[in-house]
Amino acid sequence: VIGSVLGDSSQRAIQCRIAALLAGIPDTVPLHTVNRQCSSGLQAIASVAAAIKAGYYSIGLAGGVESMSTNPMAWEGGINPRVADCDAAQSCLIPMGRC
């Protein structure tokens, strides 16, 4: 579970999947994002902890991908150059519905 707030909804999912792929996490591992404005990373951690406590997960990974304190509200940054070295991460950049 990854907390993210700055990108639009589809961009959040894409950036989190790319981060997982670049970290070596297989694409068979489920991933989802949460958006809780300035506490998205903390919400991700709380969600995983609650799911483990409830028995839904035996293990989980959670975190956040931005710092609201250090990013302007209209951030238009570039894509991590390492994406070019990972075919699976590159495929996340294709807009939905296009081949």
Cite the ranges covered by each PLM segment.
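Short glycine-rich phosphate-binding loop at a beta-alpha junction
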Residues: 1-3
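Acyl-thioester C-C bond-transforming condensing/cleaving domain
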Residues: 9-13, 20-21, 25-99
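Short beta-strand-loop/turn "lid" adjacent to the catalytic site in phosphate-handling enzymes
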Residues: 6
